[in-house]
Amino acid sequence: MDFGLFTCGYQHLPLETAFYDAKAFGYDYIELWGGRPHAFASDLLTGDASKIRDLIQKYQMPVYIYTPEHNAYPYNYMIGTEHQWEESMNYLSSAFRAASDIGAQYTLVSIGHGGSATPNQRKQRLERSLYCLCAAAEEADQTILLETLTPYESNTCTRLEDLREILDKIDSPALLGMCDVVPPFVQKEDPVDYARVLGKRMGHLHLVDNDGQSDSHLLPGDGIMPLRKIIQELREAGYDGMATIELVTNYMSDPSFYAELALNRVKELL
């Protein structure tokens, strides 16, 4: 597996710190958090993309995945008025263009909370959104990595079977599924089944630990997940690709320390 550093935890530091750390600690790539001050889509499209490309070149550290901030304020394509939906589509379409500008191959899109809409209404809205987004992604030469969230975060498409169904329905070359190990774990599903069921349509992995009763993304080894077994069985199931160690805001107090510790712990599991 290739292991990626997620830059979200570095948002109070210069972005260059994340690139420096990724190189120094032995990460293989960066998954770039698309929020301010580092890499908001409109900022990248108005000149900041060159700064990212300079960091990639300076540290010889590729950005494979761009992960725009969405599903909360102010963008969630699964909820709100028609105008708000259109703004969300425009925002994510701009994120695809920004990702291409920095040389990323993939843009990560997750499925937010659908509010009080009925299950059928949420399904229709998700399908409509993904048809629109896939067209925009193809135009920008991007591939979408579609991520399920936990039931603590979303009420739409939280399980593997939901993801398989929507991938079958949309059937776009610009759309792949992925597995964040937390949503299946808290719903008593086996994360490895994502690789078994999706096969070549599983394009990415978020690897962290969890307490089994929340959406917490914990440092590997600090939760109760059988990570060694999961990694081994993912490989046996045919998945040996990108795996971002997705440390988020829990570790912003000292992101460098935790990024190094997380990678060392994961490598001990191999």
Role assignments for model-derived ranges:
Residues 1-6, 65-78, 108-114:
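N-terminal small/glycine-rich loop or linker at the start of catalytic domains
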Residues 56-64:
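Glycine-rich, aromatic-flanked loop segments that form ligand/cofactor-binding clefts
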